[in-house]
């Protein structure tokens, strides 16, 4: 999996086990600029990123400018995106990673010295 910030896209590659060669299998258009990708045990992907790229650049230059954060859970088969978190940057500016744990989702940022610990429903 490769996140592409400027085109707001996630590329999915198939890997040949014998050679290690990668072949593009699909591109998934997103509504935000994706940063890091976390693979869940069930094959779904948690992707964190930046809904407003120009605001993110302003945040890079001035940390007092809040930058929105977004996290989605992508299911590949069938393809489906579920927004997990969206914030204008008041709780956490410039989300860069979302790590699912049992009963929790940890969301980290590019520059913050803290992360969010969000409780999630337990699925049985």
Question: Where does each model-flagged region fall?
Answer:
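Short, conserved, GDST-rich strand-edge loop motifs in beta-rich repeat architectures
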Residues: 47-66, 117-118
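Beta-rich, blade/repeat-based domains predominating
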Residues: 28-45, 52-53, 90-102
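Beta-propeller blade signature
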Residues: 65-78
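Short loop/turn segments immediately following the C-termini of beta-strands
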Residues: 4-5, 15, 50-52, 110-112
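Blade-edge beta-strand/turn elements of extracellular beta-propeller
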Residues: 3, 9-31, 76-89
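Blade-level signature of beta-propeller repeat domains, shared across WD40, Kelch, NHL, RCC1
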Residues: 94-124
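Beta-rich catalytic cores
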Residues: 6, 33, 67, 93-94, ...
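Residue position within the beta-strands of beta-propeller blades
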Residues: 1-2, 46-48, 107-108
């Amino acid at each position: 999996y490769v996140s592409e910030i400027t085109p707001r896209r996630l590329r999915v590659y198939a890997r040949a086990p014998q050679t290690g060669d990668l072949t593009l299998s699909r591109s998934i258009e997103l509504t935000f600029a994706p940063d890091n990708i976390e693979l869940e045990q069930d094959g779904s992907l948690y992707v964190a990123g930046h809904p407003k790229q120009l605001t993110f650049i302003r945040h890079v230059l001035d940390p007092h400018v809040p930058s929105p954060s977004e996290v989605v859970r992508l299911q590949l088969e069938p393809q489906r995106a579920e927004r997990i978190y969206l914030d204008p940057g008041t709780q956490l500016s410039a989300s860069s990673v979302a790590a699912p744990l049992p009963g929790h989702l940890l969301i980290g940022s590019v520059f913050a010295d803290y992360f969010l610990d969000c409780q999630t429903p337990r699925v049985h």
